[in-house]
Amino acid sequence: MLLIPAIDLKDGQCVRLKQGDMDQATIFSEEPAAMARHWVDRGARRLHLVDLNGAFAGKPKNEDAIRAIIAEVGGEIPVQLGGGIRDLNTIERYLDDGLSYVIIGTAAVKNPGFLQDACTAFGGHIIVGLDAKDGKVATDGWSKLTGHEVADLARKFEDYGCESIIYTDIGRDGMLQGINIEATVRLARAVKIPVIASGGLSNLADIESLCEVEDEGIEGVICGRAIYSGDLDFAAAQTLADRLRESDDA
């Protein structure tokens, strides 16, 4: 089970939002590259970046901070990025800069042809981010709820050739209410590609619960507010996940 620290970027700073509200941002660091180093030094094996300004603007907005993070840790672990990725040129530029994966969210739902083209052109590097509430997909930085069932879209995007799916329960994100295990497992069972859980991770009990269902196809979990607030010790959590995996394999 990969525990993946999230670095959310707003105006060049590392922040956390409460339920996706740009007006409810807590600044955790003015040096995102140093924050990336912090998590790698504590055992992170992948990083999850979000260009928040980009997500709302529909185009890249934190490229300097993103490049600084890649320069700091990109040679050691995979780095994935979402937010504001709406065209193939942006994907190509980011991959050339050293990103391992780009995450397509709103654009995948609104323009499936773009996702299909991206998967064809950059196979193995495209992750789809599906944000949902009560099983329905949301777009545009969570501001719009669609009528699409998350499992239906996930199967469609799997057919296009995406590498994996990040599933965020937006009713829980940034609220420390616990991962929605049931909904995440339901999605993982609907597809054959890996699912990465997101939204609401709060403590070691959540890690244990996720590890119990890892074999359903859940590859990892995005770690957000809990590792910044101190509710979850990242290094201890990754160690626990590794130990549980080893005991399962034994």
UniProtKB/Swiss-Prot annotation:
Record-listed E.C. numbers: 5.3.1.16
Residues at the active site: D8, D131
Annotated catalysed reactions: 1-(5-phospho-beta-D-ribosyl)-5-[(5-phospho-beta-D-ribosylamino)methylideneamino]imidazole-4-carboxamide = 5-[(5-phospho-1-deoxy-D-ribulos-1-ylimino)methylamino]-1-(5-phospho-beta-D-ribosyl)imidazole-4-carboxamide
Assigned protein family: Belongs to the HisA/HisF family.
Gene name in the database record: hisA
BP GO terms, sorted: L-histidine biosynthetic process; L-tryptophan biosynthetic process
Broad EC category: isomerase
Name of this protein: 1-(5-phosphoribosyl)-5-[(5-phosphoribosylamino)methylideneamino] imidazole-4-carboxamide isomerase
Source superkingdom: Bacteria
PANTHER family per record: 1-(5-PHOSPHORIBOSYL)-5-[(5-PHOSPHORIBOSYLAMINO)METHYLIDENEAMINO] IMIDAZOLE-4-CARBOXAMIDE ISOMERASE
Organism encoding this protein: Paraburkholderia xenovorans (strain LB400)
Localisation per UniProt entry: Cytoplasm
UniProt GO cellular component terms: cytoplasm
InterPro entries cross-referenced by the UniProt entry: Aldolase_TIM (IPR013785), His_biosynth (IPR006062), HisA_bact_arch (IPR006063), Isoase_HisA-like (IPR044524), Isoase_HisA-like_bact (IPR023016), RibuloseP-bd_barrel (IPR011060)
Keyword Hydrolase (UniProt): no
One of the record's GO molecular function terms: 1-(5-phosphoribosyl)-5-[(5-phosphoribosylamino)methylideneamino]imidazole-4-carboxamide isomerase activity
CDD domains on file: HisA
Pfam families referenced in this protein's UniProt entry, alphabetically: His_biosynth
Claim: Amino-acid biosynthesis is one of the keywords in the record: yes
Keywords, ordered alphabetically: Amino-acid biosynthesis, Cytoplasm, Histidine biosynthesis, Isomerase
Metabolic or biological pathway: Amino-acid biosynthesis; L-histidine biosynthesis; L-histidine from 5-phospho-alpha-D-ribose 1-diphosphate: step 4/9
